[in-house]
From Swiss-Prot:
Protein's name in the database: Glutamate-1-semialdehyde 2,1-aminomutase
Organism annotation: Halobacterium salinarum (strain ATCC 700922 / JCM 11081 / NRC-1) (Halobacterium halobium)
GO biological process, one term: protoporphyrinogen IX biosynthetic process
EC number from the UniProt entry: 5.4.3.8
InterPro entries recorded: 4pyrrol_synth_GluAld_NH2Trfase, Aminotrans_3, Aminotrans_3_PPA_site, PyrdxlP-dep_Trfase, PyrdxlP-dep_Trfase_major, PyrdxlP-dep_Trfase_small
Modified residues (N6-(pyridoxal phosphate)lysine): K264
Needed cofactors: pyridoxal 5'-phosphate
EC class: isomerase
Organism classification: Archaea, Methanobacteriati, Methanobacteriota, Stenosarchaea group, Halobacteria
One annotated GO molecular function: transaminase activity
The gene coding this protein: hemL
Amino acid sequence: MNRETSRELYDRSLDVLVGGVNSTVRAAPQPYPTFVQSGDGGHVIDADGNRYIDWVMGLGPLLLGHDLPQPVTAAIQRRASDGPLFGTPTEIEVEHAEFVARHVPSVELLRFVNSGTEATVSAVRLARGYTGRNKIVVMQGGYHGAQESTLVEGDADHRGPSSAGIPPAFAQHTIPVPFNDADAVTEVFETHGDDIAAVLVEPILANKGIVEPVAGYHETLRDLTHDHGALLIWDEVITGFRVGGLGCAQSEFDITPDVTTFGKIIGGGFPVGAIGGRTDVMEEFTPTGDVFQAGTFSGHPVTMAAGLETLQYAAENDVYEHVNRLGGRLREGLAAVVAEHAPAYTVVGRDSMFKVVFTRDGDAQSGACTDGCRQDPDCERHAACPKTGADVGDAAVQRWNRVFRPQLLDAGVLLSQNQFESQFVSYGHTEADVDETIEAYRSAL
């Protein structure tokens, strides 16, 4: 497959863009990134004219695929023609907030921002302002954007910034614990409970191999935060309006967080973020409270139109039935391939998310786990399935970067840029896309 134009564009980009990209993960593919020219349905076409089945889907925002339905396209065009920006409130942002609050029971008030990172930055500031405390608890391997408060690694006793440029003092207020380790987080609350403003957690470790929670873990976090007067913040930037449909992952896991952060799908493919939660907490934001939060582009009318029309289309059509069914078919098909050719590997995912983690131990998945690991304690390979971010990190291999992903690319299948990011099914994907992808995995494995 000829990718000479992508190579030339990457060479040019290295002269004017840092590392040749505008987001670090885009530089991960070997030996250079694929430059995409356009998309249609569940496919993208690169700068050389090569067509790929696209399971990246913009890293998650494109629930409907690359061909937006006519009502969504019309709403975007109509808002853009009205004018690019006003710096005033608009009706469309009210309508979008009403839709979210109507479908996500934990959300009473909402504040739109411009990215998932901005949402989590604001949520952490909100929690500190509301509680008058400084410390937050995060999960090892969890991802909450490029922000100082969460770019922290280590454990409760030994921690520090995970990036240059962050003062070590930030890490003193952030306590990382292993996902799914109830004893570890309980011990942290026993030691620091009066100083903890919030626990910030993804319902699923969606940026680190799609790690499912073990039974009772989220209930433990809910109880600990409630008992110690801390806030439970769910980061649904990835899972929101994908896992659990319009009710989001919190409806699927039956947990009511105090605050939720959103992004990706609620913008319909345009830059977006949001913070939603209980009225008494959310009203700590200015202008009703003392926690400052503002943004020139927040509630941008084009983004609001794209996001609202996307969610309305999903509500009125068979979008979730379609993407979840194809997601299930993918996971079951990949589980069969893995059982035959690489039984130590683990198929993970839920609803319209999927991934194969290159774990090194364990028998082939069977029973309930053929639809993706569910942390079933009765499963014979329960001990081998990833339960923490570290487990997924231990499964990282050069084979994925240098052999497996390039081979899938040559077969016309575009996977996530690294072996940790999730892959996503869209409304634009077809049964044929699923069949072709399963066969590409079979050939590569």
